[in-house]
């Protein structure tokens, strides 16, 4: 473990030559500019090649402010944009398995979603960010990890525009919407 101003980097690297050291230095540089915490891991064949984490679970005004709760391997984080490709890959796998039709209404898989004029919203409209549910209203404060809370709100919520008529990045809701569909299809 090394310590910088008000953060500590916990590092495990199993890479040849200087590669592990360079990755760690870059991580430490980013962490030194951050006011929170972060993790970075690389696995190959189920074995860790790089595992780095450090900083604070709280947002601080400055990277030099004291760390109240250290960032650990177990710290949960909302990835937002980082999940879009993963979620779309899961949808593609469900299509490939023959259990998801992107042209079908979301309500075929998630009946409660048909509320508030959304009965004809398709899975494709969710995938292409045209559904008009760009936020949850009301916002379930401090419930980023509560799929049930978000899916219940999104099922009842009216879109902010006619689905399919506009495109806007569904930064917060994309994962919740498609996770709710996948959960109802697969049961997990």
Report each predicted region and the residues it spans.
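Short, contiguous pre-domain boundary segments
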Residues: 2-12
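Active-site SXXK
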Residues: 21-27, 46, 78-103, 178-183
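Short, conserved catalytic-motif segment at the N-terminal edge
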Residues: 12-77, 156
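Active-site helix/loop module of the DD-peptidase/beta-lactamase fold
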Residues: 73, 81-82, 94-138, 156, ...
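Aromatic- and histidine-enriched alpha-helix N-cap/loop-to-helix transition segments
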Residues: 35, 77-86, 118-121, 168-176
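Catalytic-site signature segments of enzymes, centered on catalytic residues
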Residues: 73-75, 135-188
